[in-house]
Amino acid sequence: MEYRRLGHTDIDVSAICLGTMTWGQQNTEAEGPEQMDYAVEMGINFFDTAEMYAVPPMAETQGKTEKIIGTWFQKKNNRQDIILATKVAGRAPMDWLRDDGSGTEQTPAQIHEAVDKSLKRLQTDYIDLYQLHWPDRPIRIFGGLGHKEMGGEINKIEDILGALADIQKAGKVRHFGLSNETPWGIMKFLHHAEMDKDLPRMVSVQNAYNLLNRIYELGSSEIFHREGVGLLAYSPLAQGYLTGKYQGGAMPQGSRKQLFDRLQRYEVDGAEEVIDSYLDIAKKYELDASQLANQFVTTRDFVTSNIIGATSMDQLKLAVTSIDVELTEEILADIDKVHLRAPNLCP
């Protein structure tokens, strides 16, 4: 396993991060520990979760993922060996996360409540990386183009950072990161931390990045090189579409598409043809399509860690061992030809 520095911290994280969002929904409470055991055996020291998980978000399963991880920590007595990342929800009408029944947003009070609940579920007294799951301001996230307004007062970035500073001073969190964030948002958070040294500096951003969505390269990748804010890339397989399992209208039993029908981000016009082209590249070079897609993400120089997810051990093993796949200049050139023909179809 390869290890990379997390932003301007003294922490080295594995180039592959274990994603967990299906635990407690598609994956049972027994399957989560099996995945963690295998990940550690393969050298992975970085786990990512969120207060909202399992996915899709609902009151019945909220918090289950963190609880599975916390139980594993207590059984293994190895908390110190894992770099643990979790997230506080952004603005949404999810009225089951907060004690007062309000929807989620990133007020100081909600941030304090959220981190304390995560610590309890995770059975730990500190979190290594605490991330803002999505911005608390008008912005289009989780797919689509254009600007999207949302109602209500917007919590000021400096107030959010002030709350984060408080929980850091209390020893509850070591470092902070962003998620589903824009170049403007990343730089505003960095600017406030630069102007007020008492505010924490963001060390990472967790955004979608894959062969169908390379939007990150257009603005945010420069921030990595100039500011040291690393990308934690999620959805490297485009929610499974880059494996080819949904091609031609296929609907595998037990898949996320079959169970929840919420993957429309990767069903835009032209996407199936582009996916076919990437599948052809994998076939041409005798590679597994999922490993091609994963290793493309892992090997980008602005990626700190590739967040993989799996609902079976076979999927997990393919994802983890993708780090051993060599992508030659010829393979990368073929990938870029497809990308330039139809760039960023699924932002």
Per-segment meaning from a language model:
Residues 1-88, 112, 125, 169:
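N-terminal binding-site loop/beta-alpha segment at the start of enzyme catalytic domains
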Residues 15, 46, 126-129, 175, ...:
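Residues at the N-termini of beta-strands
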Residues 20-30, 97-109, 147-155:
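Active-site mouth loops of central-metabolism enzymes
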Residues 32, 65, 111, 115, ...:
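Aromatic/hydrophobic pocket-lining residues that form the small-molecule binding cavity
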Residues 56-63, 92-105, 138-146:
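Surface-exposed, active-site-proximal loop segments in enzymatic domains
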Residues 107-126:
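An active-site-proximal structural segment forming one wall of the substrate-binding cleft
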Residues 135-337:
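Beta/alpha (TIM)-barrel catalytic core signal, keyed to glycine-rich beta->alpha loops juxtaposed to Asp/Glu
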